[in-house]
Amino acid sequence: MDIENDIRNRRIIRNISNLLDDDILCDVIITIRDGEEIKAHKTILAAGSTYFKTMFTTPMIARDLVTRVNLQMFDKDAVKNIVQYLYNRHISSMNVIDVLKCADYLLIDDLVADCESYIKDYTNHDTCICMYHKLYEMIHIPIVKYIKRMLMSNIPTLITTDAFKKTVFEILFDIISTNDNVYLYREGYKVTILLKWLEHNYITEEQLLCILSCIDIQNLDKKSRLLLYSNKTINMYPSCIQFLIDNKQNRNIIPRQLCLVCHDTKYNVCNPCILVYNINTMEYSVISTIPNHIINYASAIVDNEIIIAGGYNFNNPSLNKVYKINIENKIHVELPPMIKNRCRFSLAVIDDTIYAIGGQNGTNVERTIECYTMGDDKWKLLPDMPIALSSYGMCVLDQYIYIIGGSTLYIDYTSVHAVNSIDMEEDTDTSNKVIRYDTVNNIWETLPNFWTGTIKPGVVSHEDDIYVVCDIKDEKNVKTCIFRYNTNTYNGWELVTTTESRLSALHTILHDNTIMMLHCYESYMLQDTFNVYTREWNHTCHQHSNSYIMHNILPIY
């Protein structure tokens, strides 16, 4: 009986399909391009299309003996294919994009799903830009969101392809202006995308102004800002220049809070502990504890996410693990490991690229430098430093990474309670060298030597100046000194100020034209500040409940 039903069903379907060829009892005429017409039946079209069903049941149209439908805006072969589909005919996949657009317009859900499945099988890293070009206006369809997600996640490599070079302005604007957190880019990388596209395409003044308005210029890193201001195309248009000038006022961005990377001596002395610190009230809250027993690691902030890299514990002389901690949701994610094991080193951040420089690898001191761009699957090595260094001071200014002082010999491992102190008189060779790495041209440069050899000095940049905070020994005692170097004049290092009270740990950060030095010890928070304009010191001591040993200070914007 079931076999007879199947035969009967196929016969009925075949009879309905044959109605299209018989050209009888037709009550709808579809006009397509070149003036061609397709005769069809309202009932059959309405059964498969919500669009046709709604149209044909409208009272005014329902009274018509023959209804005319204009679909000349679509590819005529696509329309023919869709009519064939509604009559249960086999259709070609040659023009699947055009069929999808027309099927979406006619609200034929089954055909849309079939087209999406076919396109998904065809779409990959190499074809996603081309596919998005054809479909970006249909972002409401799931397959288009899928293609966009693939494009956005692979942009670091796609911007070097011919397909990206030929991308139309609308696609570029769509990429840079997106505010969806799933594929939201950092401001600096938006600049990278824009400048790469401008190398191969013409853009009008109005279009460029629209793109620039999608970039948060004031919160742009210095390297990206420099590249943006010096671009020839941007400098062709007065309104774009004025837009950048208007947004240049706040060059030194003030952190709204600080992130303190510490060790909690009250619980587990080897676990890094992340605190958020209110600068004005001197109050803090613990947001995360990393479940890894490490000390002398490096830390940095990338787009308000904390990066913890390297370090060592008493089972491993040095590590290459890298972790990312989201400040808001406190989720820990493991990133690709560094190529080299490192401890007693620093992480520099320019745009969304992290640079791991020197440090100790076992009993060796490294000259190597490697970098990782957020979203990549691995680190890559860059040109070596002129000398091997660990426990140096470091800061970033524009496209340069400045390295001051450091140890050229292996430093023995210290207990967690002594993690901030290094005895410079025991088996250490301190450097007074000052070098910088040009991240645009990938070269190292030598600058005037520092006054003396120094280990772990505090280093910050302010406008065109580099400030170094360090301890200097004289015949009587040890003083905390601040030195300045102007990157425009190259006149060497100037002693700015000294203070008699030695700061036991020089964790420094720039905040509102002030060099701030924080130190947690036992149950006290010490906060010392020096204003670079007024040259005034301010010393504050605040008691708190927990015992922390501070490891680093990071800005939260």
Swiss-Prot record:
Coiled-coil regions listed: none
Kelch repeat extents: 305-352, 353-399, 415-464
Cell compartment(s), UniProt: Host cytoplasm
GO BP: symbiont-mediated perturbation of host ubiquitin-like protein modification
Pfam family, one: BACK
Keywords for this protein: Host cytoplasm, Host-virus interaction, Kelch repeat, Modulation of host E3 ubiquitin ligases by virus, Modulation of host ubiquitin pathway by virus, Repeat, Ubl conjugation pathway
Domain annotation BACK: ranges: 143-223
Domain notes: The BTB domain is responsible for the interaction with CUL3 while the Kelch repeat domains supposely serve to recruit the cellular substrates.
Functional note: Probable substrate-specific adapter of CUL3-containing E3 ubiquitin-protein ligases which mediate the ubiquitination and subsequent proteasomal degradation of host target proteins.
The protein, known as: Kelch repeat and BTB domain-containing protein 2
